[in-house]
Amino acid sequence: MPISNPRKRPICVAQSFLSKHATKAELSQAVSRLESLTQQGIRLPFDLLASLLQQCGDTKSLKQGKWIHRHLKITGFKRPNTLLSNHLIGMYMKCGKPIDACKVFDQMHLRNLYSWNNMVSGYVKSGMLVRARVVFDSMPERDVVSWNTMVIGYAQDGNLHEALWFYKEFRRSGIKFNEFSFAGLLTACVKSRQLQLNRQAHGQVLVAGFLSNVVLSCSIIDAYAKCGQMESAKRCFDEMTVKDIHIWTTLISGYAKLGDMEAAEKLFCEMPEKNPVSWTALIAGYVRQGSGNRALDLFRKMIALGVKPEQFTFSSCLCASASIASLRHGKEIHGYMIRTNVRPNAIVISSLIDMYSKSGSLEASERVFRICDDKHDCVFWNTMISALAQHGLGHKALRMLDDMIKFRVQPNRTTLVVILNACSHSGLVEEGLRWFESMTVQHGIVPDQEHYACLIDLLGRAGCFKELMRKIEEMPFEPDKHIWNAILGVCRIHGNEELGKKAADELIKLDPESSAPYILLSSIYADHGKWELVEKLRGVMKKRRVNKEKAVSWIEIEKKVEAFTVSDGSHAHARKEEIYFILHNLAAVIEEEASRT
């Protein structure tokens, strides 16, 4: 049927054009027509404008969203109706402009529940929980969405006390809950690692009949795993009738993080379908366990099966290469990334720098750092400074820190740790003390136990025990294992028996099963010729069933890394003769180098 009114023809054409482009997300072209349509006196339908605003928000197209807002003002809608105002609020919040959203909200003639929830949700997603709370408290009425938003907002922010308070108040309000009501509670369980809280949440989900919800069940399993309760996690897993890939991966990750790689790999093999995340969970577990070779074997198998690695897969495998100082494996991973056009993120680039450094190729580390497109991430600088520290280049590390500050990159707590280590390994006591003061005064970094441990190591290695004791007395907290370890380490270097004995006693109290304090104290006694105390200490270790951890060494033979321990000499190591031959040659090189110095 032909359009009789000629004024309606451009409206229909415009509507058709904009609708078409909105569905294709070609917002720039669609919105660019608004000005010409306005000049023709065409007022667009509300539902079309609402649809465009929603797409602007979803694609974070702020410029186009503002054009639509301007179109509304020009065409006489300085105060749009409730529908359009709600969409404007949503668009501004999604585009990270909560102040603009607040202006729209304040100018509304009539607000509905969706308007209030939109503001609360927007503030929560922007991390502005104080403002979200103010709006929530001002609401004339609330529904399940209002309460769910506040619970999950506080839980994700790590404010577990407030999250639980809101959850309890919500349940007391009498408003009917839904499956999403447990999402915030379970997020709090995962973050708090409180077993009793998780059991209560598990019980409530079970009673409510929502255990079939895969997301909730996955959170319950994750919470049990983080509490170290793998039996409960596995029981929950076994009771599930529907298991998706995320459930399997969560349980595998739980076993891997607790070091039970046998259970993790068994479950991995039983998986009906595997994805890059499940492969990465297993690889990362072996890296944490110190089994770099096994992690790299899995990576090669993953590639052979055509599974595409993700960013965390690369960072884990590069850490595996670094842990066994295998430059060849690290280069292979780097080469694969280049061949497959992988654009590495900050963590992967830092892992590359670290891998090359620990594999003895500092030049390659510096080359990777130089070609970084964006050096505004503090992680790059920290890793490079740490690499220079590992190679004993303290002065160069200090120059790198100066460059970092000139580049207007704000140092963080890790920066202070790595620069103190750099100064410690190069004997730069004055420079280390200067940066310790500078970081706290100029950059607002509050020193923690790890920073003081580094400072003690710096002073102790240089033999400045008076200054060391003064710093210990000035600490605003009681020493923890980091600090006592640092004290014992420097006492071992300088043979300070009295302070070393005190540090060892404190470490044994903190971690009775660790053999490290016994061994270091035993070395101090041995250096002083006090063999009766050495024997006595060994007797104490035997009585308390403290076993010395075996030190593992790696050596590359025919492009394969072989691991061996001291005790392997008396056993049938598969490649014992080849290892002996290489070690004999290395010893000869070391003796020759030593004779030259």
From Swiss-Prot:
Keywords of the record: Repeat
Region (Type E motif): 483-558
Pfam families attached to this UniProt entry: E_motif, PPR, PPR_1, PPR_2
Annotated region (Type E(+) motif), positions in chain: 559-591
Lineage: Eukaryota, Viridiplantae, Streptophyta, Embryophyta, Tracheophyta
Protein's recorded name: Pentatricopeptide repeat-containing protein At2g21090
GO biological process, one term: RNA modification
Family statement drawn from the similarity comment of this UniProt entry: Belongs to the PPR family. PCMP-E subfamily.
Keyword Transmembrane helix: no
PPR repeat windows: 45-79, 81-111, 112-142, 143-177, 178-212, 213-243, 244-274, 275-309, 310-344, 345-375, 377-411, 412-447, 448-478
Molecular function in Gene Ontology: RNA binding
PROSITE patterns with a match to the protein in the record: PPR (PS51375)
